[in-house]
A protein has these predicted regions:
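N-terminal accessory segment detector
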Residues: 1-109, 117-139, 143-157
Length: 157
């Protein structure tokens, strides 16, 4: 069995391998899309199909807790939105600490791509601020597509 501390650099190295040997960044994105469809059909997809944005909230509160993330999350069920500020992503944090490898340059890109189709197919849009990924930080909002834009200040939590 591979531990999570071993999986993280292996995942990053796989992205680099696909990028180098399999057709560049577009091939990596196709891989992320495939993983998203295959993996999320068993956990996120049933939750958002049945519960909408509340199912997304349930999924992320559980998964981010399991990952022991330093994250602040806000749920606004009245406006159909959930916001998160990942103050320190443990996965990217580990990669930044390693001196023996260089992380895949778009490692954090997998988060936006993995979930996009499942969310969109169930009426949920997402936006993200990935300007802080070089120090393991990002912000994201997920919102009901029919509600237009994410609420003001989502990128400031």
């Amino acid at each position: 069995m591979v531990s999570c501390t071993e999986f993280i650099p292996m995942y990053s190295e796989l992205f680099k391998y696909i990028d180098d040997k399999g057709g560049g960044h577009d091939a990596v994105v196709r891989y992320w899309e495939w993983v998203g469809e295959e993996y999320l059909r068993w956990n996120l997809e049933p939750l958002v199909r049945e519960k909408g944005i509340e199912g997304a909230w349930e999924y992320w509160t559980r998964s981010l807790s399991e990952e022991a993330c330093d994250v602040k999350m806000v749920f606004d069920p009245e406006n159909g939105q959930m916001m998160s500020h990942m103050r320190h992503c443990p996965s990217k944090g580990h990669l930044l600490e390693y001196t023996w490898m260089e992380p895949y340059y778009d490692y954090c890109g997998h988060c936006a791509v993995l979930y996009k189709k499942t969310l969109n197919d169930n009426g949920i849009s997402q936006a993200g601020d990935y300007s802080g990924v070089d120090h393991a930080e990002c912000r994201a909002v997920k919102y009901l597509t029919g509600n237009g834009k994410p609420m003001e200040g989502w990128d400031e939590i």
